[in-house]
Every structure is written in structure tokens, then in C-alpha cells.
């Protein structure tokens, strides 16, 4: 397999989370994610690429969302906007079961 294809496959397998640095909802969601990873090691297997939409606007513009935080698996939108702790946990559980 070519290096480019391997890199593309890696990117696909990573969850992406679009944020804004000063967004209180993004900060809360990130704190919950860290809390989940501390509580249950299975969640540590979920790789999340954090993308600040102001810093990486050219990447952010390739995805269909308006509100942050926004979570994607590949091009599939998993969540957009104000999150709840249980909502994020449900997304993670579905993601781990490949049920998305």
C-alpha cells in the first residue's frame, strides 16, 4: 500500500472534533472526553483529532456543520452543537461497537 493511502486510512479511522478555542461548550465536551478516558480505558482507544476551525478553516470548510463542538467519523456527522455528557458517552459507545 502506498504511504498516501495509509495516511488516508489513518485519517478515516480517527474521529474529528471541530472546536473554537474559547467556546465554553467545546471546553466542557473536551473535559468530559478526558473524564471518560480516565474512568474507562476502553475509551482511550478512540483517537480524536481536535481541529480549531479558526486556525484550520480550510479543513473545517470541507465538513457540513455550523455549530461547535462538532464530531465526525470520516464524513459522517456524529454530533453538532451543545453537547451533553451522556450524549457524548452514547456516541463513543456506538463508535466502539462500529454501530455508526
Question: Over which residues does each language-model region extend?
Answer:
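Local sequence-structure signature of Cys/Sec-based thiol-disulfide redox active-site neighborhoods
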Residues: 2-39
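Secondary-structure boundary motif
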Residues: 38-42, 97
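Thiol-based oxidoreductase modules, predominantly thioredoxin-like and allied folds used
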Residues: 43-57
